[in-house]
């Protein structure tokens, strides 16, 4: 009896413990073994009695009873008849829940093909049979016969015959001379007759012989599928079905609505169709109907089954009554609403509530205010239990009554229950892990949740009506995790960059900034104060103000913990802030003795966290917040319209610019500049004007003014205070309020030439207002798009990185990356210190002068170490990286370095992949969607010169310069670089200098900081002559290849090359400029490298010299306007990040030299140029490149070129970088390019996150030589798998396989994960599952996603530890059982047991 009672709660099978899941094709025997009976009728339920029809789709005899423990006819009711089968209605007396698990089946009268194996590319059936998909379809849908046994006739095996041909063949050869079949039976016979072993051997042999690449690919494809079938034990004929499984009825319910109608799942319709057609087919076969009718019916059955499995995959979509496509079995799995993403990865949870949030400034950081009503509902079970324990109620019913009536004792008990029971707060969208944090609830009146102001940044919450959800962790373990890991006090640092995220903002910043301002001539200036008591006394009595310059003593402690006091020049306000600082020898008063802008506050909190630990920081933050709020309130800072000061010089600046623009218009009218050049210049001029007005305005607002009556300094401008402190508003917004709005962009991204001269204080004119509506609307449209795109990017990133978990402490690798500071246009964008902080040094870092070890290899670089490195002026450091980590699964802690969210070395089990994905995805919504058009925006101007950011000695690498006729040094080389070295000969900086730039320094010059190195024209690309001589034109035919425009007022003629291929007469022209060595133009000058001085012109080039004129080497003979590169949009923002992560080839991608050598020109084609690189290394073959004519191309014959140099400019394709320069170059390219996009938006992300993602993109290797392995060259194999197999081969003394790393985009990489469950839940569900089933894949459940889907703890964090403990325990149990078996006497010695335990732990 006891067993029976226990079974009440767990009626069915026991939970199975499993380590992996295997998927394969279901055999007919399997389908029958699952089934509880055959469904013979299409009926569902009786419309009068609402009881299921017998043998129908809801039959109770097959699927189980409708009510618990009650048969259909009502003869047997209640528990006592459990397990009895009623003799009248045939229903088993059991729980109705079995209707969710019992399956049925349909016996088909004719076999049908499974559409997934037929149509899901590559079609498995067609590949196996070596027929085309079209042919297979013609056979299956009864259009053609296939010859299965030609006998002695002239027909060939597997030949297709149409109806007519078949009839003719029968007439010709007789019916029994050959066999030809049609329909799925034919395919079934063919598949069943395949001898896979023999076919595999034949294919191997054929592969060895064949040379054609296409044939190889085809053979490899077929061989793979054959081997898949052999390895998995699937039989090919199982792809053709003779029985169809029917899913349990409660998974496709039929619900009666009022009014006698029914709501039903689409599947029932689809199943009814199959049953109807199948029954009709059976009847026709029994009646011996004519072949054509039977064949038609068989085709209908095939189509019905197709629609059931995957509606719309073939033929037209089957629709229901309301013209809506029916949802087939495949649709149940696919997409956001499918089983995987809707129910397995995202579930709704009990014990949760949501409400509007309001601010709770009096809360502590670890608290949140929870409305009493909500708490009562959320904690009900706990309250019932406590009421029972205290004896207030004896039954749950009584407890329920007490709670409903809200008795006073209930509130006391609620207080007890809630004490120290954390709840989780979540704000949607949860973009990173700080979107869910734990707090201790504090009961409050009212209906809104109170949130602590400091955690708003993490949640990205504001109080304009945002809502948040509350969840209650129930189990003790969950509460523990919430408290220890998720409490808001543990999330002080941002996981993306390690900077504090609990930083005062808005009002708090304003209050603290106001406290820290210094004013001149305030009362009490120059007084000295001994302690804070005196100071407060003086402030109360208005002897001093908060901003007076005073001397004050600040007490701190030294290294030994003794109190020391020091005198500082400061203000009372700063001392008040200083009072709150924790006493610590490493934290000096200087950190407060400055204007407390948001940045400085962040630095201060960071310092406190690093030196004083978490607890002190939390207390400090709370106190700082209180102080900020109270002083913001007292200061009473607000602003009126008079605070927006318009600079007096505005009208003058605008007038100057207008004059300049007029001048450009005139130059354009005179034909001196092109339309595009004019546009660039105008846009530029207005850009500069806007900036100058903004500067003037800032100067005006910042200016310190004194009150003429009292002589005291006047209060600072409120708007300036808000903006400068970082509380609200930016310089840009101030510029629009009181400067000038400046240039606007059209929706296409181009900039409108006429700027908005007014500002908001003056008000806009109608035209200006109209112009500005463009931008505003585009902004709104962009925001909507951006959110969706950013979310999708995050989803792909999480998917690709989800199994990157810290799985080992140290992999012991000797590889790493070299880190250098990032310098852009002479400015240091990211210092070396920023980039290496919190990373592990690969080798010992030595002092460049003394040679002493600053940091040992294998240790983490901390803040103090960074200072040492920067003092030693080291320029590059080798560090370990996740990219070069050699751990088999996951990443090791040493290669990853510091856990940014905690500031300590990363723990084992940390899911660094997911953190990386969130850190990159979360700021995605802040990135722009726009593609920048090169319209000469203000950004282009800034990059027309280089200034030195260091002092040192200049060295020119690949020096190739000449002095032109004006006496300037001009760069003639393509890959010249200026190096700046310090006195010890160490490189400080490298600048690549573009062709045609003017150089201001030469080899060996001494250069000062800020000195110009070179400058160039940003709007044109020059073509320079390399020799002195006289100009001659070739193929420059007026009207065909050149147009001449003469300027009437000046008489200047401008020649521009036009597209000569448009006109058929000009098809053979090759416009070029030649330099003759003599004035008569008889001899062409020779270049130094051989070759003739002939310069081929591309379309749109403007000629700068007249024929016959004399030129010196280095002179410009033609120029190509940069806006001819206007097709080249600079993709910016989100699309650029996605493009990089997806590893797409850019549209006009750069061509990179694969070898070092000398350039030669080969025979060109009609519209392509052939370039050959003759290698320096004799053992290599020359490499050829084809380049479209008309592309700007700047190499000349005989130029030396290095491996990795660009032959054609553009964005390089990441695949090329990997193939030519290797993994490290690729990593640094991707990291820098992605960081650049984020840096533009001012978002800080640590490099290591991008490296983790790139590591996941580089998991696959393409086999180049198979050695003695089973691989075929061209296979894509997991890096880890290849290593393991090679280890085995080497151990056996065989030849290992070799391969080259390949780069996969994040979508591709996610779909190629070893886990099919994870891939199927990501995208292309049907394809992934088909592939997995054919190859009989086994999912070892190693990533996070697959474990969530099967409902287990994830193998990261605490879940990873639990799994490890369980593994050790299992090993230990096995050992004990074995030992007991061996020694039949039970007295197993204690020592032995401890021994075994130790061994198990080691394993």
UniProtKB/Swiss-Prot annotation:
Query: Which residues make up the binding site for Zn(2+) 1?
Result: 71, 73, 86, 89
Family matches, as CDD domains:
RNAP_beta'_C, RNAP_beta'_N
Q: What HAMAP family does this protein's entry cite? A: RNApol_bact_RpoC
- Tell me a GO biological process for this protein: DNA-templated transcription
The name under which this protein is listed is DNA-directed RNA polymerase subunit beta'
Q: What does the annotation say about its assembly with partners?
A: The RNAP catalytic core consists of 2 alpha, 1 beta, 1 beta' and 1 omega subunit. When a sigma factor is associated with the core the holoenzyme is formed, which can initiate transcription.
Cofactor(s) of this protein = Mg(2+); Zn(2+)
UniProt: Mg(2+) binding residues: 462, 464, 466
Q: Does the keyword Metal-binding apply?
A: yes
Query: Which molecular-function annotations from GO does this UniProt entry contain?
Result: DNA binding; DNA-directed RNA polymerase activity; magnesium ion binding; zinc ion binding
Its job: DNA-dependent RNA polymerase catalyzes the transcription of DNA into RNA using the four ribonucleoside triphosphates as substrates.
One Pfam family of this chain: RNA_pol_Rpb1_2
The lineage, from the top, is: Bacteria, Pseudomonadati, Pseudomonadota, Alphaproteobacteria, Hyphomicrobiales
Reaction equation(s) it catalyzes: RNA(n) + a ribonucleoside 5'-triphosphate = RNA(n+1) + diphosphate
- List, alphabetically, the PANTHER family matched: DNA-DIRECTED RNA POLYMERASE (PTHR19376), DNA-DIRECTED RNA POLYMERASE SUBUNIT BETA (PTHR19376:SF54)
Organism per entry: Bartonella bacilliformis (strain ATCC 35685 / KC583 / Herrer 020/F12,63)
């Amino acid at each position: 009896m006891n067993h029976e009672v226990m079974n009440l709660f767990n009626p069915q099978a026991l939970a199975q413990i499993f380590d992996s899941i295997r998927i394969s094709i279901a055999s007919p025997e399997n389908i029958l073994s699952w089934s509880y009976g055959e469904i013979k009728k299409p009926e569902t339920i009786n419309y009068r009695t609402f009881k299921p029809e017998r043998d129908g789709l809801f039959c109770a005899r097959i699927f189980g009873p409708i009510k618990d423990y009650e048969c259909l006819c009502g003869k047997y009711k209640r528990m006592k008849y459990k397990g009895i089968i009623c003799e009248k209605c045939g229903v088993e007396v059991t729980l109705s829940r079995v209707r969710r698990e019992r399956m049925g089946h349909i016996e088909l009268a004719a076999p049908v093909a499974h559409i997934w194996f037929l149509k899901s590319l590559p079609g498995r059936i067609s590949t196996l049979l070596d027929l085309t998909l079209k042919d297979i379809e013609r056979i299956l849908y009864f259009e053609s016969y296939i010859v299965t046994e030609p006998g002695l006739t002239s027909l060939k095996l597997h030949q297709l015959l149409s109806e007519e041909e078949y009839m003719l063949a029968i007439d010709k050869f007789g019916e029994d001379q050959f066999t030809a079949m049609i329909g799925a039976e034919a395919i079934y016979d063919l598949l069943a007759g395949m001898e896979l072993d023999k076919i595999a051997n034949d294919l191997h042999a054929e592969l060895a012989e064949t040379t054609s690449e296409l044939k190889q690919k085809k053979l490899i494809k077929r061989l793979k599928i054959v081997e898949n079938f052999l390895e998995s034990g699937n039989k090919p004929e199982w792809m053709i079905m003779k029985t169809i499984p029917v899913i349990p009825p409660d998974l496709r319910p039929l619900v009666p609505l009022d009014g006698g109608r029914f709501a039903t799942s689409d599947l029932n319709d689809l199943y009814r169709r199959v049953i109807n057609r199948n029954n009709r087919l059976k009847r026709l076969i029994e009646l011996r109907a004519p072949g054509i009718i039977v064949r038609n019916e068989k085709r209908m059955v095939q189509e019905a089954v197709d629609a059931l499995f995957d509606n719309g995959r073939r033929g037209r979509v089957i629709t229901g009554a309301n013209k809506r496509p029916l949802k087939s079995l495949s649709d149940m799995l696919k997409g956001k609403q499918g089983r995987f993403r809707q129910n397995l990865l995202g579930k709704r949870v009990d014990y949760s509530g949501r409400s509007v949030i309001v601010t709770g400034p009096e809360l502590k950081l670890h608290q949140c205010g929870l409305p009493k009503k909500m708490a009562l509902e959320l904690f009900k079970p706990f309250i019932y239990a406590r009421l029972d324990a205290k004896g207030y109620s004896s039954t749950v019913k009584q407890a329920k009554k007490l709670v409903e009536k809200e008795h006073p004792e209930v509130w006391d008990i609620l207080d007890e229950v809630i004490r120290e029971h954390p709840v989780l707060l979540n704000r949607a969208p949860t973009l990173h892990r700080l979107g869910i944090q734990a707090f201790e609830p504090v009961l409050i009146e009212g209906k809104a949740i109170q949130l602590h102001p400091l955690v708003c940044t993490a949640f990205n919450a504001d109080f304009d009506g945002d809502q948040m959800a509350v969840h209650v962790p129930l189990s003790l373990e969950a509460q523990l995790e919430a408290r220890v890991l998720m409490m808001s006090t543990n999330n002080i640092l941002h996981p993306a960059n390690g900077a504090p995220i609990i930083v005062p903002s808005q009002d708090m910043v304003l209050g603290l900034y106001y406290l820290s301002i210094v004013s001149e001539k305030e009362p009490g200036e120059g007084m000295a104060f001994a302690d804070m008591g005196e100071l407060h006394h003086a402030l109360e009595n208005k002897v001093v103000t908060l901003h007076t310059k005073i001397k004050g003593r600040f007490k701190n402690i030294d290294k030994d913990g003794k109190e020391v006091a020091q005198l500082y020049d400061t203000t009372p306000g700063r001392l008040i802030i200083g009072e709150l600082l924790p006493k610590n020898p490493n934290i000096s008063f200087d950190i407060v003795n400055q204007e407390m802008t948001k940045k400085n506050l962040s630095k201060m909190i960071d310092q406190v966290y690093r030196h004083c630990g978490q607890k002190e920081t939390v207390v400090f933050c709370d106190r700082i917040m209180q102080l900020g709020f109270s002083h913001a309130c007292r200061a009473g800072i607000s602003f009126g319209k008079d605070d927006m000061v318009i600079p007096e010089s505005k009208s003058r600046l605008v007038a100057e610019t207008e004059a300049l623009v007029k001048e450009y218009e005139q130059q354009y009218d005179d034909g001196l500049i092109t339309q595009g050049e004019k546009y660039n210049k105008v846009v530029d001029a207005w850009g500069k004007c806007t900036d100058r007005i903004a500067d003037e305005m800032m100067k005006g607002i910042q200016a310190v003014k004194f009150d003429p009556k009292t002589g005291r300094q006047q209060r600072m401008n409120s708007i300036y205070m808000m903006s400068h402190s970082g509380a609200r508003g930016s310089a840009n917004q101030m510029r629009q309020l009181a400067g000038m709005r400046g240039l606007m962009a059209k929706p296409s991204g181009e900039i409108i030439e006429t700027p908005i001269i007014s500002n908001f204080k003056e008000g806009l004119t109608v035209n200006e207002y109209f112009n500005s509506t463009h931008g505003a609307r585009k902004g709104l449209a962009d925001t909507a798009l951006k959110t969706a795109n950013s979310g999708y990017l995050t989803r792909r990133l999480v998917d690709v990185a989800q199994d990157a978990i810290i799985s080992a402490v140290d992999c012991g690798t000797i590889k790493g990356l070299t880190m250098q500071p990032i310098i852009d246009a002479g400015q240091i964008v990211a210092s070396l210190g920023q980039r290496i902080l919190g990373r592990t040094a690969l080798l010992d870092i030595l002092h460049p002068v003394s040679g002493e070890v600053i940091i040992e290899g294998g240790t983490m670089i901390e803040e103090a170490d960074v200072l040492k490195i920067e003092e030693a002026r080291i320029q590059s450091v080798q560090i370990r990286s996740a990219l070069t980590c050699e751990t088999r699964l996951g990443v090791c802690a040493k290669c990853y370095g510091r856990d940014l969210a905690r500031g300590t070395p990363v723990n084992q089990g940390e899911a660094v992949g997911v953190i990386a994905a969130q850190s990159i995805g979360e700021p995605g919504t802040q990135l722009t969607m726009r593609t920048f058009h090169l319209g000469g925006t203000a950004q282009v101007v800034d990059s027309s010169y280089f200034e030195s950011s260091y002092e040192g000695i200049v060295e020119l690498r690949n020096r190739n310069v000449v002095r032109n006729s004006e006496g300037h040094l001009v760069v003639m080389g393509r890959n010249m670089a200026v190096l700046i070295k310090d006195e010890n000969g160490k490189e400080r900086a490298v600048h690549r200098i573009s062709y045609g730039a003017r150089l201001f320094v030469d080899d060996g010059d001494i250069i000062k900081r800020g000195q110009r190195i070179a400058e160039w024209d940003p709007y044109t690309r020059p073509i320079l002559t390399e020799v002195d001589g006289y100009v001659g034109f070739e193929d420059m035919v007026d009207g065909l290849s050149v147009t001449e425009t003469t300027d009437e007022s000046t008489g200047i003629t401008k020649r521009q090359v036009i597209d000569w291929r448009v006109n058929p007469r000009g098809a053979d022209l090759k416009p070029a400029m030649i330099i003759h060595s003599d004035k008569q133009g008889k001899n062409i000058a020779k270049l130094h490298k051989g070759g003739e001085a002939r310069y081929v012109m591309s379309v749109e080039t403007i000629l700068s010299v007249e024929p016959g004129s004399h030129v010196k080497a280095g002179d410009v003979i033609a120029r190509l306007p940069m806006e001819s590169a206007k097709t080249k949009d600079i993709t910016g923002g989100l699309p650029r990040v996605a493009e990089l992560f997806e590893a797409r080839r850019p549209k006009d991608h750069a061509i990179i030299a694969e070898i070092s050598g000398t350039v030669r020109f080969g025979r060109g084609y009609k519209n392509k140029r052939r370039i050959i690189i003759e290698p320096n290394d004799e053992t290599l073959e020359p490499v050829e490149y084809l380049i479209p004519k008309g592309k700007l191309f700047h190499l000349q014959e005989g130029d030396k070129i290095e491996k990795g140099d660009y032959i054609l400019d553009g964005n390089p394709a990441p695949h090329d970088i990997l193939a030519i320069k290797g993994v490290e170059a690729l990593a640094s390219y991707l990291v820098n390019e992605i960081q650049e996009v984020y840096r533009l938006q001012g978002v800080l992300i640590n490099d290591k996150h991008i490296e983790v993602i790139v590591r996941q993109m580089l998991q696959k290797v393409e086999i180049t030589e198979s050695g003695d392995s089973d691989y075929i060259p061209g296979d894509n194999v997991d890096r880890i798998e290849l290593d393991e197999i090679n280890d085995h081969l080497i151990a056996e003394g065989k030849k290992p396989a070799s391969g080259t790393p390949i780069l996969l985009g994040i979508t591709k990489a996610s779909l190629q994960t070893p886990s099919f469950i994870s891939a199927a839940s990501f995208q292309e569900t049907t394809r992934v599952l088909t592939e997995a089933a054919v190859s009989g894949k086994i999912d070892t459940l190693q990533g996070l996603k697959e474990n969530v889907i099967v409902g287990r703890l994830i193998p990261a964090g605490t879940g990873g530890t639990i799994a490890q403990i369980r593994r050790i325990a299992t090993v230990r149990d096995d050992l004990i059982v074995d030992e007991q078996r061996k020694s039949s006497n039970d007295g197993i010695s204690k020592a032995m047991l401890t021994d075994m335990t130790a061994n198990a732990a080691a394993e």
